[in-house]
Swiss-Prot record:
Optimum pH is 8.5 and 10 (with pyruvate as cosubstrate). Glycans are attached at residues 54, 205. It comes from Aedes aegypti. Pathway: Amino-acid degradation; L-kynurenine degradation; kynurenate from L-kynurenine: step 1/2. GO terms for biological process: biosynthetic process; L-kynurenine catabolic process. This is Kynurenine aminotransferase. Its cofactor is pyridoxal 5'-phosphate. Its main location: mitochondrion. It catalyses: L-kynurenine + pyruvate = kynurenate + L-alanine + H2O; L-kynurenine + 2-oxoglutarate = kynurenate + L-glutamate + H2O; L-kynurenine + glyoxylate = kynurenate + glycine + H2O; 2-oxobutanoate + L-kynurenine = (2S)-2-aminobutanoate + kynurenate + H2O. One of its GO terms (molecular function) is pyridoxal phosphate binding. Substrate binds at residues 44-45, 453. Catalyzes the irreversible transamination of the L-tryptophan metabolite L-kynurenine to form kynurenic acid (KA). Also catalyzes the irreversible transamination of several amino acids including cysteine, tyrosine, glutamine, methionine, histidine and phenylalanine. Can use various keto-acids as the amino group acceptor. Its EC number is 2.6.1.-, 2.6.1.63, 2.6.1.7. Optimum temperature is 60 degrees Celsius (at pH 8.5 and with pyruvate as cosubstrate).
């Protein structure tokens, strides 16, 4: 207490001030150290909590189990590739020229209709005028009266028709037979519904000379072995994408007999139904004895009228099967665009008046595509590829393996050769195709690695450019 006794002297006051300053400095330093220590602990706690919180949120918002294992669609990747490198694009399946003018005019008229309801919601299961037109067409084609209100469903493209069919009929543990190669959405749609896909590949029965898509066949014993009490569904695609195979009556009868034996639903994806080349014939499996009651058939306005961007499709079949699709549709999409449905209805009404005439678009389109098919098959063979000549559709697969010495596959890192080939061709040669291994299940992807898929529904001038690009590439050192 010395500083109190010296309080009244100047020296004492100075000493007192110094001591007080020292005490204040000590207290201040200890306080700062304590505050710093607390702050450090607090920051660490925040970091730990933040890390735990982020991890918890990450786990909570992971992709649902029913979609886990799915990979990025080949279309997402290759559309981006085309946008970046700007090749001549023979990859995606769409025409690069205008659809029938009457369809475009009909859409403009519907959108500009004086009736305000023309641009409002329409009937959820299909615009009345469109389902009437679809009923009239398919009643003729399958030789039975189809009820437009209960046996036809209009969807957002054939994609949604497939989705509604699979979601509406496949339950947990149901087995679904898928023929390979297949349109790439089949497998993930089945898995998302809780189904178990069972695969069987089409394989060429010869390797030399001219190969037709008819030469790609199923092993009937292998197919029969896949059917059992758990089999709910088989998906067929005729005309086929990507091979262009048109299943003949004998092949369809094998499928039909197995479906009847095991009480299995047949989903027939027939979006290329009007693109069948002479002398081949498109046979609808629902017309075979005992098959109407167990078949859902899927079609597409995008393919029928060459209007892929309009995204309108449909399913038709017996009411007992269609009601399941309606339930999925009403709780997923509910209704499709009214003006587009109106325009497509006008398109069907136009073609129904001349259905048996060569001027009918459904009839003329196959002749137009056949010439393009023959030209592509010729120039692919000329440069050393071995094309499979399709019976229908507008795609062609070709074996490029004899040209592998002209391709530097080391520049790409993909696991599959056809991915490396198509990416290298896109970047280095300026021509884009699609890798067919994308259309196979994982165990069978090797079956597509030596092939590339090209679309020949393009302007003649662009097909000629493709031929020139390949000839130049083939002739380079």
């Amino acid at each position: 207490m010395m500083f109190l006794r010296n309080h009244n002297s100047v020296g004492g006051a100075i000493r007192t001030a110094v001591v007080l300053q020292d005490l204040q400095f000590i207290v201040s330093n200890k306080s700062s150290a304590l505050t710093g220590a607390v702050s450090s602990v607090h920051r660490q706690q925040i970091r730990t909590m933040s890390s735990t919180s982020n991890e918890t949120m990450h786990n909570k918002f992971d992709l649902p189990k029913r979609y886990q294992g799915s990979t990025k669609s080949v279309w997402v990747e290759y559309i981006q590739l085309a946008a970046q490198y700007k090749p001549l694009n023979l990859g995606q399946g769409f025409p690069d020229y205008h659809a029938p003018k009457y369809a475009l005019d009909a859409l403009a008229a519907a959108a500009n209709s004086p009736d305000p309801l023309a641009n409002q919601y329409t009937r959820g299961f299909g615009h009345p005028r469109l389902v009437q037109a679809l009923s009239k067409l398919y009643s003729q084609l399958v030789d039975r009266t189809i009820n437009p209100m209960t046996e036809v469903l209009v969807t957002v493209g054939a994609y949604e028709a497939l989705y509604a069919t699979i979601q509406g009929h496949v339950d947990e543990g149901d087995e679904v037979i898928i023929i390979e190669p297949f349109f790439d959405c089949y497998e993930p749609m089945v898995k998302a519904a809780g189904g178990i896909p069972r695969f069987i590949p089409l394989k060429p029965n010869k390797t030399g000379g001219t190969i037709s898509s008819a030469d790609w066949v199923l092993d009937n014993n292998e197919l029969e072995a896949l059917f059992n009490e758990k089999t709910k569904m088989i998906i067929i695609n005729t005309p086929h994408n990507p091979l262009g195979k048109v299943m003949d009556r004998a092949e369809l009868e094998v499928v039909a007999n197995l479906c009847k034996k095991w009480n299995v639903l047949c989903v027939s994806d027939e979006v290329y139904e009007h693109m069948v080349f002479e002398p081949f014939e498109h046979i609808r499996i629902c017309t075979l004895p005992g098959m109407w009651e167990r078949t859902i058939t899927i079609g597409s306005a995008g393919k029928t009228f060459s209007l892929t961007g309009w995204k309108i499709g449909w399913a038709y079949g017996p009411e007992a099967l269609l009601k399941n699709l309606q339930m999925v549709h009403q709780n997923c999409v509910y209704t499709c665009a009214t003006p587009i449905q109106e325009a497509i209805a006008v398109g069907f009404e136009t073609e129904l008046k001349r259905l048996k005439s060569p001027e009918c678009y459904f009839n003329s389109i196959s002749g137009e595509l056949m010439a393009k098919r023959d030209y592509m098959a010729s120039f692919l063979a000329e440069v050393g590829m071995n094309p499979t000549v399709p019976q229908g559709g507008y795609f062609m697969v070709a074996d490029w393996s004899s040209l592998d010495s002209k391709v530097d596959l080391t520049q790409e890192t993909d696991a599959r050769k056809d991915y490396r080939f198509t990416k290298w061709m896109t970047k280095s040669v300026g021509l884009q195709g699609i890798p067919p291994s994308a259309f196979y299940s994982e165990p069978n992807k090797h079956l597509g690695e030596d092939f590339v898929r090209y679309c020949f529904f393009k302007k003649d001038e662009n097909l000629q450019k493709a031929a020139e690009i390949l000839r130049k590439w083939k002739g380079s050192s």
